[in-house]
Regions:
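Conserved N-terminal glycine-rich FAD pyrophosphate-binding loop of Rossmann-like flavoproteins
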Residues: 39-61
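Glycine-rich FAD pyrophosphate-binding loop
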Residues: 26-46
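Predominantly flavin-linked oxidoreductase catalytic cores and closely associated redox partners
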Residues: 116-171
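A conserved beta-strand/loop capping segment in the N-terminal third of enzymes
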Residues: 55, 60-111
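N-terminal Rossmann-fold NAD(P) dinucleotide-binding loop
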Residues: 18-19
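Short phosphate-binding/catalytic loops that engage adenosine nucleotides
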Residues: 30, 63, 122
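Beta1/beta-strand and adjacent pyrophosphate-binding region of the FAD-binding site
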Residues: 2-15
Length: 171
């Protein structure tokens, strides 16, 4: 039997982009459902570094980026390679951005952002595999279907399921 869930927005993928999108929309009063194919914590191959521009976006989301909150601040980009001794390129001093970057493992970063989205009112559903978009008779996307047959309906669907986005390709 197929069950159906309705939202204002369905976001597929709870990586940094999907979780941030969901949190911003929920803060503006929309009912958002965030679907993630695995359960947290989960790992992802990544350099784990955040530039000052990325840090600014975390601040805009309302994330505590202090070292006391467990973040490792960096003063610049450390370069290692070839026959040159390692050196640091300091982050540029720009008035609109913090003067530091950060390092955070993706196992920690992704879960922090997803839990933050939940704290903003987002309905986070983990361990669901989105298989395809649901189309209305005119061909407009009106939701998504998961491998267990559950349908998540919304007038807006965001494909934030990564570089090899199956949903994005199907859209």
């Amino acid at each position: 039997m197929t069950s159906q869930m309705e939202s204002d927005v369905v976001v597929v993928g709870a990586g940094p982009g999907g979780s941030a999108t969901a949190a911003h929309l929920a803060r503006r009063g929309l009912h958002v459902t965030l679907l993630e194919k695995v359960t947290f914590p989960r790992d992802k191959v990544c350099g784990d570094g955040l530039t000052p521009r990325a840090v600014k976006q975390l601040i805009r989301l309302g994330i505590d980026v202090s070292e006391e909150a467990g973040w490792k601040h960096t003063e610049g980009l450390r370069i290692h390679g070839g026959r040159i001794a390692p050196f640091v390129l300091p982050w540029p001093e720009l008035a609109d951005y913090p003067n530091f970057g950060m390092v955070c493992r993706r196992t920690v970063l992704d879960e922090r952002l997803a839990r933050h989205a939940e704290s903003q009112g987002v309905a986070l559903v983990e361990g669901v595999n989105v298989t395809d978009p649901i189309l209305d008779p005119s061909g407009r996307i009106r939701g998504v279907r998961t491998s267990d047959g559950t349908e998540y309906s919304a007038p807006v669907v965001v494909a934030a399921d990564g570089n090899s986005s199956r949903l994005g390709l199907a859209m």
